[in-house]
Design a protein with these regions (language model features):
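Structural preference for solvent-exposed beta-strand-turn elements
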Residues: 1-167
């Protein structure tokens, strides 16, 4: 039953397409209660998948960023795959819900992703009033920043760290 998960699926489809990530999502949760646990669990699982796919991070660019325009919306996203989890999330939604998705759960999703992946993640809405476009732009900007951060660079022979190690 997708009731309550449509906006999340649409957002993850944007993440998949704009980050060039191979992603299939199936959510079995307690959506009849509310979407909190399902959205949070989806973020945890995605974060774990990102951590696993990143492997030892040798040759990885580590940092990625994107400023993404979508109609009247402008979103900044920056990623550091250095192993230290952190989320800086700056968004002021003007509605409590988009479809059946509580807008406060967008923060919960990205918090779960950043901590499960061990990434430093900054998402800032620079402009925008349409909550649907803001959420969609966040996921697409995150995808593009993560694609850049996890990209390989032949000039990087080990991990990109002055300490010689990444968490």
């Amino acid at each position: 039953n997708l009731i309550g998960a449509e906006q999340l699926f649409l957002s993850l489809e944007g993440f998949h397409q704009h980050g060039f990530f191979d992603l299939k999502v199936r959510i079995d949760g307690d959506l009849q209660v509310d979407g909190h646990h399902s959205v949070e669990d989806c973020g945890i699982v995605l974060g774990q998948a990102i951590r696993e796919a990143a492997g030892d991070k040798k040759g990885m660019k580590r940092f990625g960023q994107c400023i993404l325009p979508m109609d009247a919306t402008l979103v900044l996203c920056a990623v550091d795959m250095g192993g230290r989890p952190w989320l800086n999330f700056d968004a002021a939604f003007t509605a409590e819900r988009v479809g059946y998705l509580d807008t406060e759960l967008v923060h919960e999703f990205f918090y779960a992703v950043s901590y499960s992946a061990g990434m430093n993640l900054h998402i800032k809405v620079l402009d925008g009033q349409n909550n649907h476009h803001i959420i969609e732009a966040m996921f697409k900007a995150f995808a593009r920043a993560l694609d850049e951060a996890t990209g390989m660079d032949g000039r990087i022979t080990d991990v990109l760290s002055t300490k010689g190690t990444l968490g």
